[in-house]
Each structure stands twice: as C-alpha cells, then as structure tokens.
Curated annotation (Swiss-Prot):
This is Orally active insecticidal peptide. It comes from the Eukaryota. It comes from Selenotypus plumipes (Australian featherleg tarantula). Keywords: Amidation, Disulfide bond, Ion channel impairing toxin, Knottin, Secreted, Signal, Toxin. Residues 20-44 form a propeptide. InterPro entries: Conotoxin (IPR004214). Disulfide bonds join 46-61, 53-66, 60-73. Transmembrane segments: none annotated.
Amino acid sequence: MRVLFIIAGLALLSVVCYTSEMKERSSFNEVLSEFFAADEPQERDCLGQWASCEPKNSKCCPNYACTWKYPWCRYRAGK
C-alpha cells in the first residue's frame, strides 16, 4: 500500500512540474514574440531614417531631411 502512495505522489509531482514548465515556456515565448514584433516596421505616412527619398517631394518624417547631396532621409541636426 505504501508503494502505491509513493508512485501516485511521484506521478502527481511529475504532472505539477510539467504544467509549471509549460506555463513558463509559453510566457517566455510570448515575451520573445513581443520583443521581435517591436522590430517589425510599422505603417506610417512618413519615411524613417535611411529611407530613400526625392528632394523635390520629401516624405521624410519630422526631424529628418532629404537633400540632393544625400537622397535618403537623415536626421536634421540643429533645426
């Protein structure tokens, strides 16, 4: 009878550890997916840094400038 309780206790402990590990793994995967989703470009009406642009029709975001010398959106320092 004692052996049966020990086996049942070990089985219960195994199930508890397994569920705990699955919870931890799923929360870790959620954190990783949110972290990498932040790197994905978002849709916006203006062009971000290093985006190719036309000086005549600059669609760069505020604080970025597009010039003839540098036909890409770059940070506009001091203005």
